[in-house]
Amino acid sequence: DRAVAAGATYIVSPGINPEVVKHCQRVGIPVIPGCSTASEIEIALSLGLKTVKFFPAEAVGGLKTIKALSAPYVDVNFVPTGGINEVNLLEYLNFSKIVACGGSWMVDQKAIDAKDWDAIETLTSSAVNRMLGFELKHIGINSGTPEQAMKDALSLAKILGWPVKDGNSSTFTGTALEFMKKPFRGAHGHIALGTNYIQRARWYLEQKGFAFDDESSYYKDGKLMAIYFKDEIAGFAFHLLQK
């Protein structure tokens, strides 16, 4: 109750206490209790929960144990904490049953004691950037016609020594330069920003005020692979691209 009064929007606990879970459910706040065994997961399921904290993650077998527990409990998702850091963060997040990770490296105790919120912001931002892994994947240039696209691609190939690959709608020089065969998005062209997790990247950027064009969404095997921002930047259309 004190946590909610202080502004908490969800509760995470190191272990599972049915009374605490039931109280959170009564007051309407999401709760993620700690579970590291099959018996504890059974308790969580009996309380109607399908997302649990996995703690202490590294000490009880880490990702190997989570995968073993996921085999019989196919509907359960995990939030591992305990021993998670920037080195192993992506290894955990790459497993589909893990919805989030927690780690104390993001909230250094010395910074907390000193109320150095800027330092904590820097640490947490670094963790988010590590997770999302943004990088420039390719630049699309509106050549306008198939002939011009090929001409432009060959010209850049002479400069860079990269191979040319002709496709249905565009011609690539290497993998970084795409020449469009007909007018496409963006006054000047488009830029693809690769990310490790496109759904997480979208949510993160929406919190920063960016909007996306859902009609531009491209799915493969039921998974979102690409989506454009609604607004251009410097005359370029930008889109996220799942790595």
Where are these regions (language model features)?
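Catalytic beta/alpha-barrel core
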Residues: 1, 8-16, 30-41, 50-58, ...
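Catalytic cores of alpha/beta
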Residues: 1-6, 39-47, 71, 84-100
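Surface-exposed amphipathic alpha-helices with a cationic face
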Residues: 4, 21-26, 45, 66-71, ...
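Glycine-rich phosphate-binding active-site loops on the catalytic face of alpha/beta enzymes
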Residues: 14-20, 53-63, 97-120
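C-terminal helical cap(s) of enzyme catalytic domains, especially alpha/beta-barrels
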Residues: 24-28, 110-132
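Vicinal oxygen chelate
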Residues: 121, 171, 175-182, 206-243
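N-terminal beta-strand motif that seeds the catalytic metal site of vicinal oxygen chelate
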Residues: 128-153, 186-193
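Amphipathic alpha-helical segments
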Residues: 145-160, 200-209
